[in-house]
Amino acid sequence: MGNKKYKFNVNYKDEAKYKDGLRSFLEYRDLGVSEASNGEYKAHILRVKKECTGEQEMHTTGFHKHLVTFQMYYVLKGWVKFIYDGEGTFIFKKGDCVYAPPKIKHNEIACSNDFEALEILSPGKHETVKVD
């Protein structure tokens, strides 16, 4: 028996639509997981916009945290550089995956021009908070 709380969802690459989001130099492809899970989860692909070239300085608010209970990042292409409070600085490349504990303070510093990643979060709708 299926769970009535969740809906079956398929998101085809050939029908993908990328939209603007949190970062001005990135575009985001919603994979439909938030709607299918009634907001419990969010899964999206994020990538550098075609008009952005070379290493990108991330235009963040500095250190921040997402008010989530789950956050996972899987790099599909290129690389990205993060600083995690209490953990250090990391460069993640194609095929690398990171699970970040809930509400960990972090900052994205730079990425390659071909950077693309899958990010999965819970809950689907959440706040991002600037921290010192």
Predicted features and spans:
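Double-stranded beta-helix
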Residues: 2-14, 19, 107-132
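Flexible, glycine-rich phosphate/dinucleotide-binding loops
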Residues: 37, 81, 126-127
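Short, conserved beta-strand element in jelly-roll/cupin
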Residues: 45-49, 65-82, 120-123
